[in-house]
């Protein structure tokens, strides 16, 4: 997990000051059926919120943990990320993710093996979910930077 945490912290620290420097026209540019860069950042906020809940709930809820999905498209629209100030968006994204870093750093080694049942009934563990979260974040950060 240490490498995952280091990668995660690097992604946060490299981008917290970079993202707000992007031109608003670039951040808000829309292609039909695609999210703008602002909306991608908003999606990362939704993902962070949901995963923060998952990463904490798994410690006290019945095992195996039942993974609950969420409607990504609806949340991005309902949260109106496209109209938010980029500094506000970036601060929210950074703050929730800093809390996830704290959780990852303090997670019990045994907890990383806790089983999680996905909606398709496949089984993963907390280690995979945390690692996949960082990979997902990196993918979308690369979209914002492109």
Residue ranges and their predicted role:
Residues 5, 9-12, 41, 45, ...:
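Generic structural concept
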Residues 27-72, 101, 115-146:
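Short, contiguous alpha-helical
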Residues 1-11, 137-146:
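Short N-terminal signal/transit or membrane-insertion segments
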Residues 5, 9, 25-27, 31:
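An N-terminal domain-cap segment
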Residues 20-23, 59, 108, 145:
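A structural signal for long alpha-helical coiled-coils and helix-turn connectors
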Residues 7, 11, 17-21, 76-113:
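Acidic/histidine-rich alpha-helical segments that form the ligand environment
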Residues 1-6, 51-93:
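Short, helix-capping/interhelical loops that line the mouth of catalytic, cofactor-
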